Amino acid sequence: MARFALTVVRHGETRFNKEKIIQGQGVDEPLSETGFKQAAAAGIFLNNVKFTHAFSSDLMRTKQTMHGILERSKFCKDMTVKYDSRLRERKYGVVEGKALSELRAMAKAAREECPVFTPPGGETLDQVKMRGIDFFEFLCQLILKEADQKEQFSQGSPSNCLETSLAEIFPLGKNHSSKVNSDSGIPGLAASVLVVSHGAYMRSLFDYFLTDLKCSLPATLSRSELMSVTPNTGMSLFIINFEEGREVKPTVQCICMNLQDHLNGLTETR
């Protein structure tokens, strides 16, 4: 059996986020001043977390957010980040660089709901979901392979699994679940993975967790909250568990969703 922690963070605010202009993949906008502050606040919030892996979309806003997080880490400042195009935002085709209101008008003209509508040259929701599944399955196989190698190397030696207190893998606030449910105590973690990505992409990935993998949710979290767009630098934590072995789909437990405690008191730049 192997399990790992997965922390997913949306990038910080850009000028186009604030102005409600669609970026997608074709508009590589940097963080705004507020966005850099958000990334720094996220880094301070996560500075005690011992991440073992870091993955980011290869777009500028996610790269800058990842840098803002890791440069404030007590343990991960020198960690190598793997930039992966599978973590990019949904491609919006002809409406990239245009106002969100234009996308809504096009969807209305096509008599479709905005999230479902695919503008010319854009990705369908299914295409975005398949990218997310492809990355997630790659990540799971990577962690399982590394866990097997560690087990072979350390046979006869004390376990080298990560510390499994949730306080060690995520600084949960008072209003969130404080432990992982387990029938056999608190099993070790093979890894703690940080991913920085984008709002529409994350919503699609979380839908896969909920719909296909039957992700369990905290009692205080509703399905609508799970499917809402994550705010800039909002954080979500999942425990991915291969208790039935690698040939069976993992179980997914959501510990918290769209957490933004780190933004309390942050002054927005005008």
Curated annotation (Swiss-Prot):
Tissue distribution: Expressed in the brain. Expressed in breast tumors. Expressed in glioblastomas.
Residues annotated as the enzyme's active site: H11, E89
GO cellular component, one term: nucleus
Chemical reaction(s) catalysed: beta-D-fructose 2,6-bisphosphate + H2O = beta-D-fructose 6-phosphate + phosphate
GO molecular function per UniProt: fructose-2,6-bisphosphate 2-phosphatase activity
Compartments reported by the entry: Cytoplasm; Nucleus; Mitochondrion
Entries under InterPro entries matching the protein: His_Pase_superF_clade-1, His_PPase_superfam, PG/BPGM_mutase_AS, Phosphoglycerate_Mutase
GO BP annotation list: cardiac muscle cell apoptotic process; cellular response to cobalt ion; cellular response to hypoxia; DNA damage response; fructose 2,6-bisphosphate metabolic process; glucose catabolic process to lactate via pyruvate; glycolytic process; intestinal epithelial cell development
Keyword terms of this UniProt record: Acetylation, Apoptosis, Autophagy, Cytoplasm, Hydrolase, Mitochondrion, Nucleus
Induction: Up-regulated by p53/TP53 (at protein level). Rapidly up-regulated by p53/TP53. Up-regulated in glioma cell line in a p53/TP53-independent manner.
Family assignment from sequence similarity: Belongs to the phosphoglycerate mutase family.
Functional note: Fructose-bisphosphatase hydrolyzing fructose-2,6-bisphosphate as well as fructose-1,6-bisphosphate. Acts as a negative regulator of glycolysis by lowering intracellular levels of fructose-2,6-bisphosphate in a p53/TP53-dependent manner, resulting in the pentose phosphate pathway (PPP) activation and NADPH production. Contributes to the generation of reduced glutathione to cause a decrease in intracellular reactive oxygen species (ROS) content, correlating with its ability to protect cells from oxidative or metabolic stress-induced cell death.
Record-given protein name: Fructose-2,6-bisphosphatase TIGAR
Annotated source species: Homo sapiens (Human)
Gene from which this protein is expressed: TIGAR
